[in-house]
Amino acid sequence: MTITRFISDWSAITERLADPADRVVAVAPLMERLLPEAPSFITAAHRRPDPMHYARHRLHVASDGSLSLFAIVWQPGQWTPVHDHGSWGVVGVVEGVLEERNYMASDGEIRSDSGIRLKRGGTILLGVGSVTSFVPNPDHIHMTGVPETRKPVLSLHLYGRNMNSFHVYDVAHGTRKLVQLPQES
């Protein structure tokens, strides 16, 4: 599957299906078929790491901002903060093993930026060819990265919006804040 076909197919799916759970069920197999083709569209620039934090490289953003696809480069020891997405998403691993550590709201739904009690959930290890997905319920809260003992990772991340911001959670203080993400190349 080419990246052009992937973009066309997931755009059609999102026009046809409104429910985020239905969208990820339909899009996850497309991501699985796209992963082996990544060498044909991932350039040297898309593989460029950042020594300070994971590097996010934009592959496509829909003109209406409804969808975005990024290649993310992770060096050993690089992690996201605990965060949510405000969207559905599908993630596939091209190289390496990506680790996802999930969190759950102890009180159910989060309604404000303070008084949030999170507890750790499960851990998922995603190897080459693995695909995972998430839907807002009301949102998927996790941290993702690569432990110091593992090799670098290259992953593809598809979101149901232009992923230019997310909530970052301070687990110890029970707060969250909306953080703008840099629009990297």
Residue locations for each model-derived region?
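N-terminal leader/capping segments at the start of a protein or of a new domain
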Residues: 1-39
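A short glycine-rich, His/Asp/Glu-containing loop-to-beta-strand
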Residues: 50-76, 131
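Conserved short histidine dyad/triad with adjacent acidic residue
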Residues: 70-84, 136-139
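Glycine- and acidic-residue-biased ligand/ion/polar-headgroup-sensing regions
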Residues: 87-106
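A short hydrophobic beta-strand segment most commonly corresponding to one strand
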Residues: 90-92, 150-165
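Short acidic-glycine-tyrosine-enriched beta hairpin
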Residues: 105-141, 181-184
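Ligand-binding loop in jelly-roll beta-barrel domains
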Residues: 136-156
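Extended, aromatic/histidine-rich regions of cofactor-dependent oxidoreductases associated
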Residues: 156, 163-185
